[in-house]
């Protein structure tokens, strides 16, 4: 299935749904140069856990994930 990832640019990824969020972060790192530990992936504004698969997170075909930078402090 196709998945859109919006970081500095909009990327289209071909995925199966079995990939983990951590794997998607690693792919984004190779595309954008943002370290995985500095990324937060969001689906409809909800942060996704690294160890969860895309299917477990409710990601469907043609979903758009937003990449946000991790904020320090509070």
Curated annotation (Swiss-Prot):
CDD domains noted in UniProt: Ubl_FUBI (cd01793)
InterPro entries in the cross-refs: FUBI (IPR039415), Ubiquitin-like_dom (IPR000626), Ubiquitin-like_domsf (IPR029071), Ubiquitin_CS (IPR019954), Ubiquitin_dom (IPR019956)
Source taxon at top rank: Eukaryota
Further comment: This protein is synthesized with ribosomal S30 as its C-terminal extension.
Record family assignment: Belongs to the ubiquitin family.
Protein name as it appears in the record: Ubiquitin-like protein FUBI
Organism: Bos taurus (Bovine)
Organism phylogeny: Eukaryota, Metazoa, Chordata, Craniata, Vertebrata
């Amino acid at each position: 299935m196709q998945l859109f990832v919006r970081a500095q640019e909009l990327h289209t990824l071909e995925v199966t749904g079995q990939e983990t969020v951590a794997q998607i972060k690693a792919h984004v790192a190779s595309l954008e140069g943002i370290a995985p530990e500095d990324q937060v992936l969001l689906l409809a504004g909800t942060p996704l856990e690294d160890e969860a698969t895309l299917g477990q997170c409710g990601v469907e075909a043609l979903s758009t994930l937003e990449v946000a930078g991790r904020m320090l402090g509070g």
